[in-house]
Amino acid sequence: MSRPVRRKDLMIVNIGPHHPSMHGVLRLIVTLDGEDVVDCQPILGYLHRGMEKIAENRAIIQYLPYVTRWDYLATMFTEAITVNGPEQLGNIQVPKRASYIRVIMLELSRIASHLLWLGPFMADIGAQTPFFYIFREREFVYDLFEAATGMRMMHNFFRIGGIAADLPYGWIDKCLDFCDYFLTEVVEYQKLITRNPIFLERVEGVGIIGGEEAINWSLSGPMLRASGIQWDLRKVDRYECYDEFEWEIQWQKQGDSLARYLVRLSEMTESIKIIQQALEGLPGGPYENLERRDFDKKLNSEMNSEWNNFDYRFISKKPSPTFELSKQELYVRVEAPKGELGIFLIGDQSGVPWRWKIRPPGFINLQILPELVKRMKLADIMTILGSIDIIMGEVDR
């Protein structure tokens, strides 16, 4: 007896672009066979603003306020990469004090970015409580940013040759207090999240990426280190003054969503270690000490005081707004919270770049999403997408 052949009906589902779990205006066209994902096609471009072309029509100092709109949750890194390129082209030396302050701000920005990844990631998989916890700690970071830069977000703090202003009175003590407090909160996160059996059920073994596969897809940041590859540009390139501090690359072997979570959680602890060392070893010490020593110098008429040393300044000689970019090519990169943030820069002996190519980590890391979600369940899409950590401002540029 012959049986009738049943036709296999596939369902096409649109997720986004206006969806709370999309982390921006991302649209996914998902093909389903029941609850199983057959195909996934990301649709990009909803937040494209022509950031590269804008850079090619602006002087660097004019373009700095724009770059904070790429990854608007880690704006210090976009500012850092924007000034690092011209500094290398012009052989501009950065005072040691300015470099230390840059590192402090970069690591605080890394913590803020990872915190705002953790909360929505937990909310995506059904845990609402950590979402409110992370905003409590993030407020402390933003208070430090506001005290030092005047802005909670979009800081516009980095300058070619240094930073815009020195640290204000009492800022170092306030930051040290935050470091001590935050380490206890990371332990609380581990108790609340890492040992939760429901959380482990949702993330363990979901979205596995092997080490060789991660390299072939050009993944970077926590996505790469969670797959067993110990690669961190702070150790590899040794930019700023990271080689003066003691810290370890955080990595995992499993390559799943749980491994990516563990890497980011551990990175926040390492960032605190770097910040504490930078604050304690800051050349010149707190600003009030520098001011007092400068006053003593005037009383004693010591014109060549060590406290007037180049390394104790917050910026070297300020270049003019029409600072010319020499005629050469250059690729610079930093280890941003989401991965390798790079700039390919071509100067043509004018005040504006001839070519300004952005290499955003989120755009590169997002490419592997269709491969990760195939043959998974519909509910796992949000878990995997959340573990990648994207911001559409830098994906679309």
Curated annotation (Swiss-Prot):
GO molecular function annotation: NAD binding; oxidoreductase activity, acting on NAD(P)H, quinone or similar compound as acceptor; quinone binding
Chief localisation class: plastid
Listed EC numbers: 7.1.1.-
Catalytic reactions on record: a plastoquinone + NADH + (n+1) H(+)(in) = a plastoquinol + NAD(+) + n H(+)(out); a plastoquinone + NADPH + (n+1) H(+)(in) = a plastoquinol + NADP(+) + n H(+)(out)
Membrane topology annotation: Peripheral membrane protein
Compartmental location: Plastid, Chloroplast thylakoid membrane
GO aspect biological process, one term: photosynthesis, light reaction
Assigned keywords, A-Z: Chloroplast, Membrane, NAD, NADP, Plastid, Plastoquinone, Quinone, Thylakoid, Translocase, Transport
Pfam families given in the database record: Complex1_49kDa
SUPFAM superfamilies: HydB/Nqo4-like
Top EC class for this record: translocase
Keyword Thylakoid included in the entry's annotation: yes
NCBIfam families xrefs: PRK06075.1, PRK07415.1
Function, in words: NDH shuttles electrons from NAD(P)H:plastoquinone, via FMN and iron-sulfur (Fe-S) centers, to quinones in the photosynthetic chain and possibly in a chloroplast respiratory chain. The immediate electron acceptor for the enzyme in this species is believed to be plastoquinone. Couples the redox reaction to proton translocation, and thus conserves the redox energy in a proton gradient.
Homology family: Belongs to the complex I 49 kDa subunit family.
UniProt protein name: NAD(P)H-quinone oxidoreductase subunit H, chloroplastic
Gene: ndhH
